[in-house]
């Protein structure tokens, strides 16, 4: 069992019950899934770029990503319908907790001039979004073997009803919020 999953059951759940006064432990918010998304607009011109992005995301997530395609043609971006424009991977259960552990303890502290992540990036329904500018903050990516620096979006989907509950949940996981 993942270290953070045990931590959630033993520490986070009782703390949230005490903080918000839930009647049942089943009411306590939990992290449902983590989605990693990498937009690769340059893949329109060069197919190799998409292969590199997929392999980078696979190393980061430990799971094969799905290539996402354009839903409609946009002449200004030289994109046609069904062109590959990015890749994404959805993590659940143990892989999700392992990734979250690596993100909090290893990857985020490796960001240059890191002062914490924004506490305002919640969507109003208890989900958190953040962007990572460079994929090299993850230890799985070797700096010498990458073709270009690429960013990615990380979406943490929770069962929390409000942003306040979601922030309390992530804070108890030692998520490094600013201030």
Curated annotation (Swiss-Prot):
SUPFAM superfamilies: RL5-like (SSF55282). InterPro entries: Ribosomal_uL5 (IPR002132), Ribosomal_uL5_bac-type (IPR020930), Ribosomal_uL5_C (IPR031309), Ribosomal_uL5_CS (IPR020929), Ribosomal_uL5_dom_sf (IPR022803), Ribosomal_uL5_N (IPR031310). GO terms for molecular function: rRNA binding; structural constituent of ribosome; tRNA binding. Keywords: Ribonucleoprotein, Ribosomal protein, RNA-binding, rRNA-binding, tRNA-binding. Coiled coil: none annotated. GO terms for cellular component: ribonucleoprotein complex; ribosome. It comes from the Bacteria. Transmembrane segments: none annotated. Part of the 50S ribosomal subunit; part of the 5S rRNA/L5/L18/L25 subcomplex. Contacts the 5S rRNA and the P site tRNA. Forms a bridge to the 30S subunit in the 70S ribosome. This is one of the proteins that bind and probably mediate the attachment of the 5S RNA into the large ribosomal subunit, where it forms part of the central protuberance. In the 70S ribosome it contacts protein S13 of the 30S subunit (bridge B1b), connecting the 2 subunits; this bridge is implicated in subunit movement. Contacts the P site tRNA; the 5S rRNA and some of its associated proteins might help stabilize positioning of ribosome-bound tRNAs. Belongs to the universal ribosomal protein uL5 family. PANTHER family: 60S RIBOSOMAL PROTEIN L11-RELATED (PTHR11994). This is Large ribosomal subunit protein uL5.
